């Protein structure tokens, strides 16, 4: 266990709670000490929803430690069942309360006797998995629970829907632009003549899960959440699934072709080539933009990409393949699925970094000095410190990345959003320069660009004046190169001579 200033993926119980609170009329009870119950506050603050977060903490306190938890946990489950009348109550421990090694399944069985709704224990190992793996497992567990229950009662509908249809699996609360992506995918399906059978878990009712097998296929847009449920449905109900993320023009087309192929295998007769051409050439602006003079200005610019597997891999391919941007480093914090990530981005970047340590990523960014960063909220902080622009492309994210306006990242509208994000993330060099020329006397002073600490070197007046004459968009680089040169040579003060010598040394 380590004390973390920043975590990319939270502890396992956060993943379970994200799934439970995404469903309609499902309540979660968290068996946890005070301090582990921050999920309510986090979700209420970030998700722009009117409803309260349906999560209750059954607090582990000294009385519980003295007498055992059963009485308190069972009472809390039964009380919530009476107050809220949920369809399902999910009980989850946290990594802290798991230390008590209690038989929580026994508590659930005991509570089920008095509760009118269903009660379930989230079957997750809190020491082995993180938030994303736990979310994936919990979703699969809930789907399996209701399909097996329906099968026992003989309530599962037989046969497929009359028209081609799809289940969209993996849309969750606190996901990166999930609501917008969901709307865009529904529009895309409508354009393709595919009905949306169910969307899970966001906004879904557990009572409707028995209808999942009626769809012709499943779509899993995010690799992190939904794959286990899709594999279970394939295994038990022979339902094929598509796990290609429709992000960027090329991958969206590949995803649509795969969906068409699955439909035709089941007796449909669809051809989506004309639709793909129409969208690529005329509807999506991204393909046109990538050939425009604006985008050509970005060709060869250096970028660093970091995020979850889905978004980091997709963004790396879009930058390298569709926009001609040089991705120096692509990275992910999903260490448990590193092989897939390496396979996806190997051809499109120089370096691959698999790490959960934000300091390691920050140091890599400082070393590479890219023109732009595409990452999470943490990389945005790093970019601010280094004065490198950053586009946020993956969770974890803060409030400004839960936009009220429509901003999907998937589908053809998503390609437009990504093109805007990329273009606006690169500093337009002349803008800084012109501000400094015409900005009067209050031009900004030189900023130290170092992740770890401020500069320990002293610049004399002449050198400082000379540095201020350097255009803003390269000044940081000149300052860093000069200081590096001075340290290597053992100078404590930077003079004009040192500046010119450093310039000679780097051949600039």
From Swiss-Prot:
<dbReference type="InterPro" id="IPR000510">
    <property type="entry name" value="Nase/OxRdtase_comp1"/>
</dbReference>
<keyword id="KW-0602">Photosynthesis</keyword>
<dbReference type="GO" id="GO:0019685">
    <property type="term" value="P:photosynthesis, dark reaction"/>
</dbReference>
<dbReference type="Pfam" id="PF00148">
    <property type="entry name" value="Oxidored_nitro"/>
</dbReference>
<comment type="subunit">
    <text>Protochlorophyllide reductase is composed of three subunits; ChlL, ChlN and ChlB. Forms a heterotetramer of two ChlB and two ChlN subunits.</text>
</comment>
<keyword id="KW-0408">Iron</keyword>
<keyword id="KW-0149">Chlorophyll biosynthesis</keyword>
<dbReference type="InterPro" id="IPR016209">
    <property type="entry name" value="Protochlorophyllide_Rdtase"/>
</dbReference>
<keyword id="KW-0560">Oxidoreductase</keyword>
<dbReference type="GO" id="GO:0005524">
    <property type="term" value="F:ATP binding"/>
</dbReference>
<dbReference type="InterPro" id="IPR005969">
    <property type="entry name" value="Protochl_reductB"/>
</dbReference>
<dbReference type="Pfam" id="PF08369">
    <property type="entry name" value="PCP_red"/>
</dbReference>
<dbReference type="GO" id="GO:0016730">
    <property type="term" value="F:oxidoreductase activity, acting on iron-sulfur proteins as donors"/>
</dbReference>
<keyword id="KW-0004">4Fe-4S</keyword>
<feature type="active site" description="Proton donor">
    <location>
        <position position="294"/>
    </location>
</feature>
<keyword id="KW-0067">ATP-binding</keyword>
<dbReference type="GO" id="GO:0016636">
    <property type="term" value="F:oxidoreductase activity, acting on the CH-CH group of donors, iron-sulfur protein as acceptor"/>
</dbReference>
<dbReference type="InterPro" id="IPR042298">
    <property type="entry name" value="P-CP_red_C"/>
</dbReference>
<keyword id="KW-0411">Iron-sulfur</keyword>
<feature type="binding site">
    <location>
        <position position="36"/>
    </location>
    <ligand>
        <name>[4Fe-4S] cluster</name>
    </ligand>
</feature>
<comment type="function">
    <text>Component of the dark-operative protochlorophyllide reductase (DPOR) that uses Mg-ATP and reduced ferredoxin to reduce ring D of protochlorophyllide (Pchlide) to form chlorophyllide a (Chlide). This reaction is light-independent. The NB-protein (ChlN-ChlB) is the catalytic component of the complex.</text>
</comment>
<comment type="similarity">
    <text>Belongs to the ChlB/BchB/BchZ family.</text>
</comment>
<feature type="binding site">
    <location>
        <begin position="429"/>
        <end position="430"/>
    </location>
    <ligand>
        <name>substrate</name>
    </ligand>
</feature>
<dbReference type="GO" id="GO:0046872">
    <property type="term" value="F:metal ion binding"/>
</dbReference>
<dbReference type="GO" id="GO:0036068">
    <property type="term" value="P:light-independent chlorophyll biosynthetic process"/>
</dbReference>
<keyword id="KW-0547">Nucleotide-binding</keyword>
<dbReference type="GO" id="GO:0051539">
    <property type="term" value="F:4 iron, 4 sulfur cluster binding"/>
</dbReference>
<keyword id="KW-0479">Metal-binding</keyword>
<comment type="pathway">
    <text>Porphyrin-containing compound metabolism; chlorophyll biosynthesis (light-independent).</text>
</comment>
<dbReference type="InterPro" id="IPR013580">
    <property type="entry name" value="LI-POR_suB-like_C"/>
</dbReference>
<dbReference type="InterPro" id="IPR050152">
    <property type="entry name" value="ChlB/BchB/BchZ"/>
</dbReference>
<protein>
    <recommendedName>
        <fullName>Light-independent protochlorophyllide reductase subunit B</fullName>
        <ecNumber>1.3.7.7</ecNumber>
    </recommendedName>
</protein>
């Amino acid at each position: 266990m380590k004390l973390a200033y920043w975590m990319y993926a939270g502890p396992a119980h956060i993943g379970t709670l994200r799934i439970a609170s995404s469903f309609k009329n499902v309540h979660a009870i968290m068996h946890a000490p005070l301090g582990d119950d921050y999920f309510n506050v986090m979700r209420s603050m970030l998700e722009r929803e009117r409803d309260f977060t349906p999560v209750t903490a059954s607090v582990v306190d000294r009385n519980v430690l003295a007498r055992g938890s059963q009485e308190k946990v069972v009472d809390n489950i039964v009380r919530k069942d009476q107050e809220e009348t949920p369809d399902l109550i999910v009980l989850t421990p946290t990594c802290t309360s798991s230390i008590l090694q209690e038989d929580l399944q026994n508590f659930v069985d005991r509570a089920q006797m008095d509760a009118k709704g269903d009660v379930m224990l989230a079957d997750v190992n809190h020491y082995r998995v993180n938030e994303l793996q736990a979310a994936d497992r919990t979703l699969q567990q809930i789907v399996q629970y209701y399909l097996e229950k329906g099968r026992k009662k003989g309530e599962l509908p037989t046969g497929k829907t009359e028209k081609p249809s799809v289940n969209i699996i993996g849309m969750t609360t606190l996901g990166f632009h999930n609501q917008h992506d969901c709307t865009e995918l529904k529009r895309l399906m409508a354009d393709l003549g595919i009905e949306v059978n169910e969307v899970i878990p966001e906004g879904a009712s557990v009572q409707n899960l028995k209808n999942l097998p009626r769809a012709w296929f499943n779509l899993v847009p995010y690799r992190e959440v939904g794959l286990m449920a899709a594999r279970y449905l394939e295994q038990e109900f022979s339902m094929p699934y598509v796990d290609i993320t429709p992000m960027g023009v090329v991958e969206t087309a590949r995803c649509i072709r795969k969906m068409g192929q699955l439909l035709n295998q089941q007796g449909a007769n669809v051809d989506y080539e004309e639709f793909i051409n129409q969208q690529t050439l005329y509807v999506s602006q991204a393909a046109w933009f990538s050939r425009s003079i604006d985008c050509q200005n970005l060709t060869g610019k250096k970028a660093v990409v970091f995020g979850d597997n889905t978004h980091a891999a997709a963004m790396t391919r879009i930058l390298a393949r569709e926009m001609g941007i040089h991705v120096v480093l692509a990275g992910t914090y999903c260490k448990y699925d590193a092989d897939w990530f390496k396979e996806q981005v190997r051809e499109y970047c120089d370096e691959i970094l698999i790490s959960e340590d934000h300091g390691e990523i920050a140091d890599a960014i400082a070393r590479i000095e890219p023109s732009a960063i595409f990452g999470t909220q943490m990389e945005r902080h790093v970019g601010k410190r280094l004065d490198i622009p950053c586009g946020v492309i993956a969770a974890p994210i803060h409030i400004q990345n839960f936009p009220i306006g429509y901003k999907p990242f998937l589908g053809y509208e998503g390609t437009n959003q990504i093109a805007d994000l990329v273009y606006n993330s690169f500093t337009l060099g002349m803008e800084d320069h012109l501000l400094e020329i015409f900005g009067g006397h209050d031009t900004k002073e030189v900023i130290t660009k170092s992740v770890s600490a401020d500069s320990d070197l002293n610049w004399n007046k002449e050198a400082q004046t000379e540095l201020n004459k350097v255009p803003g968009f390269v000044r940081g680089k000149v300052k860093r190169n000069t200081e590096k040169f001075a340290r290597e040579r053992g100078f404590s003060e930077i003079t004009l001579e040192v500046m010119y010598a450093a310039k000679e040394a780097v051949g600039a």
